[in-house]
């Protein structure tokens, strides 16, 4: 688990310290998957600004595709963003065709 500079938590669950600066130890050839929807703009900008390629890890277990639309909009404006992955905790696949359609039509960022 990495955190971006915009995440000011002083701890993470049972970890006695924070993760601030953890990105300084990650090789630049790794792709960072940002999954926290509310922090997507800050996280993507942070890791992109450090030279990492990024992808969005959208939450798909909702009842509509609004979450995905927000991710695609932000990814389209993020240099170094190279895609989006489908993540589900509930094995919910009924919106998968619509997800694919949105991704196929999305604006592509410059790599």
Which residues does each PLM region occupy?
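Substrate-binding groove of N-acetylhexosamine-processing glycoside hydrolases
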Residues: 1-111
């Amino acid at each position: 688990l990495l955190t971006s500079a915009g995440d000011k938590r002083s701890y993470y669950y049972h970890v006695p310290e924070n993760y601030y600066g953890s990105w300084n130890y990650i090789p630049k050839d790794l792709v960072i998957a940002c999954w926290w929807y509310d922090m997507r703009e800050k996280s993507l900008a942070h890791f992109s600004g450090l030279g990492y390629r990024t992808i969005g890890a959208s939450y798909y277990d909702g009842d509509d595709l609004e979450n995905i639309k927000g991710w695609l909009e932000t990814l389209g404006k993020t240099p170094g963003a190279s895609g989006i992955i489908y993540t589900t905790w509930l094995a919910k696949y009924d919106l998968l065709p619509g997800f694919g359609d949105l991704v196929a039509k999305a604006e592509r960022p410059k790599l």
